[in-house]
C-alpha cells in the first residue's frame, strides 16, 4: 500500500481554522509581536507548498523509503479474545502500528514535513521541545538526515525518566538543553523553545511537536499526521470492506489522536474517543486531564482548555507518561469536545501500567506509556459495547523508552 497525499479526503464541511487560525472560539495567535512576521511567513510557505507536486513527491518518497510507511493495521487477536464475551462475541480490536515507524513513534511524520518546509524557507537552524523524547528524537533524526543544526529543549525531570532518548538525540548530533524552570517538564521546555525562537527568528525554524501553539501549527501538524487516518481508511476498506466503528487514541497535546481522527471527523457513525492522563486521579492535584477538568485559557500562543487555579494561573500537570504530562491541549480537540464530535475520558497511572503489561503479554507488543493510556480505556469501553464493533487504537509509539520507568513500578511475575 502506498501513502496518500497530504490533503485529506474528508468532505469540505470539516471545521478548519478560519483566517485567524480559530477552531470556533479556540486557537488563534497569542504571541509577541516579534513572532507575528515569522508565523505569517510560515503560514504563507505552508499554503504554498502543502499541495505543491514537488514538495509532495519528496515527502511521500521519504515517508515510504525513510520512515517506512504505510504502517500496518494489525488485528490484535489475543487482546480481542481477552475482552470477548462468553459466547465469543465482542469488540474486534485493531492497532494502527505507528510504533513501527523509523524512530519508534508517530512524531516523525510531522518532523519530516516541517523540516522539508524549513529547507524551502531557507532556515538552517532547527529547534524543538520534547517531553517523552520521541519528538526530540524525530527532529534530531531528520536534522541529521538533512545536515541542519538542531537544538532540543527538554525538562530536567523528563531527561531523567527518558535518558535513553536523550542519548539518542545527542548521538545524532543534536544539542539537548536541560530546562530546570518550573516543574522541569514539557510545558517548561516549550516555553524555553519559544524564547529561543523569539531571539533567533530570522535563522531558526521551531518544529512544534503537537497540534498546539499559535496558528498555523495546530493545522499544519494535524495535516502532516493526517496520513495516519488516511492509511487507516484504505486499510480498513481492504481488510473488511468498511470503516471502523470506534477510533481510540491517547491525548496529551493531541497530535497522534488528530492524525487518526481527522480523516473521519465527518463520518458521523464513527465514534472518536480521546484518553487523557488521570495521573493519581482526577480528583487529586496530580493529573493531566485537561479536557476533563480544565477551563478555557491561553497557553503557548493558543486559546484552549487548560489546567488552571482559581486565579487563572496554569498549574502543574502530572502523569507517569512524559508525553501526556502537559496542562494544555490542542485547540481542535477543545473544539471537537465543545461541539460533541469527540469524547474524552481519562485513565490513571495505575491503569496505564496494567495496560502496558497486558499488551506486552497478550500481543508481544510493548507500547509507549502514552499509548498504554488508550489501551487501558478498553477496560471501561468494551463491557459497554453491543455486538462486535471494530475498534482502531492508534499505537502511537513503542515502549522501549519507558521500560526503566515501568520497572520501578512493575516486577514481572
Curated annotation (Swiss-Prot):
Disulfide bonds: none annotated. Pathway: Amino-acid biosynthesis; L-tryptophan biosynthesis; L-tryptophan from chorismate: step 5/5. It holds the Pfam family PALP. CDD domains: Trp-synth_B. InterPro entries: Trp_synth_b_CS, Trp_synth_beta, Trp_synth_beta/beta-like, TrpB-like_PALP, TrpB-like_PALP_sf. Its EC number is 4.2.1.20. Belongs to the TrpB family. This is Tryptophan synthase beta chain 2. It comes from Nostoc sp. (strain PCC 7120 / SAG 25.82 / UTEX 2576). The lineage of its organism: Bacteria, Bacillati, Cyanobacteriota, Cyanophyceae, Nostocales. The gene is trpB2.
Amino acid at each position: 500500500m502506498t501513502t496518500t497525499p497530504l490533503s485529506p479526503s474528508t468532505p469540505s464541511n470539516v471545521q478548519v481554522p478560519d483566517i485567524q487560525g480559530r477552531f470556533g472560539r479556540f486557537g488563534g495567535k497569542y504571541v509577541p509581536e516579534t513572532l507575528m512576521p515569522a508565523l505569517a511567513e510560515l503560514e504563507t510557505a505552508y499554503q504554498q507548498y502543502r499541495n505543491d507536486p514537488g514538495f509532495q513527491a519528496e515527502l511521500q518518497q521519504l515517508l515510504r523509503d525513510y520512515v517506512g510507511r504505510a504502517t500496518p493495521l494489525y488485528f490484535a487477536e489475543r487482546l480481542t479474545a481477552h475482552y470477548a464475551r462468553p459466547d465469543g462475541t465482542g469488540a474486534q480490536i485493531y492497532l494502527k502500528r505507528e510504533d513501527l515507524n523509523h524512530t519508534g513513534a508517530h512524531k516523525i511524520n510531522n518532523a519530516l514535513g516541517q523540516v522539508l518546509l524549513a529547507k524551502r524557507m531557507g532556515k538552517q537552524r532547527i529547534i524543538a521541545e520534547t517531553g517523552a523524547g520521541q519528538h526530540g528524537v524525530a527532529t534530531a533524526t531528520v536534522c541529521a538526515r538533512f545536515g541542519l543544526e538542531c537544538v532540543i529543549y527538554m525538562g530536567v525531570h523528563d531527561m531523567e525518566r527518558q535518558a535513553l532518548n536523550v542519548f539518542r538525540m545527542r548521538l545524532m548530533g543534536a544539542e539537548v538543553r536541560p530546562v530546570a524552570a518550573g516543574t522541569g517538564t514539557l510545558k517548561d521546555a516549550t516555553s524555553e523553545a519559544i524564547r529561543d525562537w523569539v531571539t533567533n527568528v530570522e535563522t531558526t525554524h521551531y518544529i512544534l511537536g503537537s497540534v498546539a501553539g499559535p496558528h498555523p501549527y495546530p493545522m499544519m501538524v494535524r495535516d502532516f499526521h493526517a496520513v495516519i487516518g488516511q492509511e487507516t481508511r484504505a486499510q480498513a476498506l481492504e481488510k473488511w470492506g468498511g470503516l471502523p466503528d470506534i477510533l481510540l487514541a491517547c491525548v496529551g497535546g493531541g497530535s497522534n489522536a488528530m492524525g487518526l481522527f481527522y480523516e473521519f471527523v465527518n463520518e458521523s457513525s464513527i465514534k472518536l474517543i480521546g484518553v487523557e492522563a488521570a495521573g493519581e486521579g482526577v480528583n487529586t492535584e496530580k493529573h493531566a486531564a485537561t479536557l476533563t477538568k480544565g477551563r478555557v485559557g491561553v497557553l503557548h500562543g493558543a486559546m484552549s482548555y487548560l489546567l488552571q487555579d482559581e486565579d487563572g494561573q496554569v498549574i502543574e500537570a502530572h502523569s507517569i507518561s512524559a508525553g501526556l504530562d502537559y496542562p494544555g491541549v490542542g485547540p481542535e480537540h477543545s473544539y471537537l469536545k465543545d461541539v460533541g464530535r469527540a469524547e474524552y475520558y481519562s485513565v490513571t497511572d495505575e491503569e496505564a501500567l496494567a495496560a502496558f503489561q497486558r499488551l506486552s503479554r497478550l500481543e508481544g507488543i510493548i507500547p509507549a506509556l502514552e499509548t498504554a493510556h488508550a489501551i487501558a480505556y478498553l477496560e471501561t469501553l468494551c463491557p459497554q459495547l453491543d455486538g462486535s464493533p471494530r475498534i482502531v487504537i492508534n499505537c502511537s509509539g513503542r515502549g522501549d523508552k519507558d521500560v526503566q520507568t515501568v520497572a520501578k513500578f512493575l516486577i514481572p511475575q
